[in-house]
Amino acid sequence: MAYKVSKDPRTDIRERTYVPNLLRGLGITAKHFFRNLFGTRDTNTQVVDRTGASLMTTVAYPEEKPIYPEGYRGLHRLVPREDGKPRCVACYMCATICPAQCIYIEAGEYEDEASDSEDRVIEKYPTQFVIDELRCIVCGLCVDACPKDAIRMDTYTHTPPEYTRQNFVYDIPKLLKGAPVSHPSDPWNKREGSEEPHHVHKEAHTRIGEGLVELKLPHGEHGGHGKALPAGAQAGHQAVVTQQGPIQVTKFIK
């Protein structure tokens, strides 16, 4: 049985040419064009507060920039101390918790002859702190995990465009921005009425070298822990100082 093809019921020439709908769309475009051309649109009021003829969903970026909501996770930044150094103590907590593994840190240790500021109390600092913004999934776990409030995502700006992928890898000079802040975890803020020390010896700490761990205690304390000991009974272990002396713990290796 043959199938009978029906003709297009739109026999009107105006409907076939789409002229009415085309003119209607051009009219809307022209209306907004002349409204913006003669300055009838209010551009001084923030986008979220506009009403009437100025209430438009389209934002003329970059002349106008939308307001990011409170709590927006923007670009990362490293928070500086008063001396300009990053607050980061190279604890690797942000790099460990990052599900995208976009954070890379290399730690350095302050020498005993360092300046008489908080370097005597804070042991480590990052010699390298790198974030690959292309791999970041903007989850904010690094901010939550940091015990020193050293990394934040409160820049309220998105990742700007770049010409190469390497430009999306942010290092310390690119991340270190913003005003210095204080944090309750600072050693001189742990007790009420205490001040930032000018000369304080470090507490007992562990320094990891090539196969040896150098254990240092404050002057006047003894107990046989001031010598260099093997880093562990087997590979993948390191010694840690406690009140009872060095103990062996398993070192997590990626």
UniProtKB/Swiss-Prot annotation:
InterPro entries: 4Fe4S_Fe-S-bd, 4Fe4S_Fe_S_CS, NADH_quinone_OxRdtase_chainI
Membrane topology: Peripheral membrane protein
Pfam families membership: Fer4 (PF00037)
Binding site for [4Fe-4S] cluster 1: C88, C91, C94, C146
Annotated [4Fe-4S] cluster 2 binding sites: C98, C136, C139, C142
EC code: 7.1.1.-
Cofactor: [4Fe-4S] cluster
First-level EC class: translocase
Keywords tagged on the record: 4Fe-4S, Cell inner membrane, Cell membrane, Iron, Iron-sulfur, Membrane, Metal-binding, NAD, Quinone, Repeat, Translocase, Ubiquinone
Function in brief: NDH-1 shuttles electrons from NADH, via FMN and iron-sulfur (Fe-S) centers, to quinones in the respiratory chain. The immediate electron acceptor for the enzyme in this species is believed to be ubiquinone. Couples the redox reaction to proton translocation (for every two electrons transferred, four hydrogen ions are translocated across the cytoplasmic membrane), and thus conserves the redox energy in a proton gradient.
Record protein name field: NADH-quinone oxidoreductase subunit I
Source organism (scientific name): Myxococcus xanthus (strain DK1622)
Gene (UniProt): nuoI
